[in-house]
Structures are given as structure tokens and as C-alpha cells.
Amino acid sequence: VKDNIIAVQSSIDNPIKALYETKKIAVEVLGKKEKSPQYQLQKYYPAIYAEIRKKELSAFGETFKMSLKKGMKSGIFRPSLDTQFITLIYFNGFRGLRDIELFPPEDYDIDQIIDKFIDYHLRAIVTAKGLKFLENYNTLKLNEN
């Protein structure tokens, strides 16, 4: 999973598009409802789940920061972002989406809530140029469905 995410982040020039492509990998790994490995770990093996959560940030944090810096350099993200802070906020928020007590799988589709979260996150950090790209990208996604 880590290698796939790093490959996506490295191969796609636009960090907004790369984040949505990374989301596809996350949804595939998280799976749907009770069958997802994340759900099983959180429910039946909470100690193992807690340990995995600790390792996530170290595994993906640097790649995420590089993507933020790429977006800042290209004018898609605001130039004054604190990349460490944004990384921590993003990962904490993403973890919250996977909390089965906050978002019970029988009530929430993981694909939809991750899309909403990414949109929420991006709107907080994009420039006018980035917002235009985001809105166009979202329109294209709607037209594909």
C-alpha cells in the first residue's frame, strides 16, 4: 500500500489529482463495512489497531508533506502553509473518518465520506488557482458518474 501511494504521489504532477487518486487506494484497502480489515482490527484487536495508527504518520507523512510543497510551488496551495501542521491535521481527520463509533459503516459509505473530507481539506489550503482546478475536477467526476 505504501509503495502504491508513493508511486501515485510521485507520478502525478497535480497534488489535488494525486490526493484523489490516493483516496482510491485507501478505499480499496479500507474496504466496505464489516468486511474491511480496518473495521475488524478496530473492533476485535484494538491494541493492534492502535499500533498501526502510530506507524501510519511516519510511513506517509513525508510523502504528504512533499505533495503539499509541490502544490505550494505550483501555486495551487497557499504559499504560507505550515506543512507539518497541515499533515497532522489531515491525518488526524482521516483517522476520524475510519472511527466506526463516529461513522458506523451501516450508516456511512467510506468512499463518500473520504470524498467529502478531501474536498473540505483542500478548500482550506488552495489558492484561487487551486480552487478553480478543484471545482473543474469535481465537475468532471460528477459527469463521469
Where are these regions (language model features)?
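Short linear capping/connector segments at secondary-structure termini
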Residues: 5-6, 38-47, 136-140
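Short, flexible helix-adjacent loops and helix caps
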Residues: 6-10, 35-41, 73-76, 99-106, ...
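C-terminal peripheral helix-coil segments that are non-catalytic and often amphipathic
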Residues: 66-74, 104-145
